[in-house]
Amino acid sequence: MTSVGPEGVSSCPHPLGAALRAHYIYRKEAVVLTKLEVLGLRSLVPTLPLNEEGDAGNDPIQILGINGLGPVKANITTAPFGAFDGEALSGMSVPKRNIVLTIGLHPDWAVQTIEELRQLLYNYFMPKLLVQLRFHSTNFPVVTIEGYVESMEPNIFVKSPTIEISIICPSPDFVAMSPAVITGISNDGSDTTDFEYIGSVQTGFYLKVEKAVETSGEGSIQILLSGEYAPQSFSARGTLDDNVRFEMNTVPGQKYVRSVDNTLGTITNYLNDISYDAIWPTLYPGVNRLAIITTVAGQNWELSYYPRFGGL
């Protein structure tokens, strides 16, 4: 089993010429957020690092607070029974996330002004702009979330000016920047590959199976996944050949089952060959036990996924 960890992200200089930094350390039960990076997704806007290095009192941009990092309140819908007390669950979902940044401005008066810092932040946080936030912490990998700026409200005519920025994130989860990768060999289901999923909410994955020993070509490929939850079983047909690999994706909104020619890039779709009782497998927090079953055992497989977190 191999795992690919998150890579460090280098900081870019800002248009005023010096590194633009700000402190923010959030402590809760030994979990420490050490750095926030803001990426403007418009062209020509560099990364804006807001970090813990150096003296917070000397940083021109300082994060005074961040709200909206905890788990988002779920929408639980129920319907009343007609003949007896109580209600029946009819659905549940987690809506958008609203992150609110409170930022203080403390320019180096020899080279900067309050207005210059405020105009710099406008490049990132003008309402309707899409931004990406990257959070660094002591207990999590580097995670990212994207959202749209709802509002940016500067408090201009005060002695210590601040700016409050509201960001709406349609997808509420924080997602690891780098994937975890696990490899193994297919078998008859008698052996499993056990690994721990560190995320706090379930996630889909990408699976690739390639020929390693002689096989008949098209055949059955089955995924068995279990752990601290109900077992999941998924069975479909796929082709394994010297130049053809099997792929599937179980991420909601991106699902597919197919075989791909490594040379020509042609794709054979197998969505219509999924078993009627198949459950699209997802990883749950905790230990997951995975078995990949092929018509002829001994084929190479690789599974990759991005851990997801419902709160920091």
Predicted regions and their residues:
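Solvent-exposed loop and beta-edge segments used for protein-protein assembly and interaction
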Residues: S93-R97, F125-P127, F157-P161, G199-V201, ...
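Polar/acidic, low-complexity leader/linker segments enriched in S/T/G and N/D
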Residues: S10-T77
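SsDNA-processing nucleotidyl-transfer enzymes
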Residues: P71-G91
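Extreme N-terminal basic, low-complexity initiation segments
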Residues: T2-G5
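Intrinsically disordered, low-complexity segments enriched in serine, threonine, and glycine
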Residues: V175-L312
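Compositionally biased, low-complexity regions
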Residues: S93-V100, L105-K128, Q132
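Short beta-strand and beta-hairpin "edge-sheet" elements
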Residues: P127-D173
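Oligomerization/assembly interface segments of phage tail-like spikes and tubes
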Residues: F84-W109, K159-D173, N288
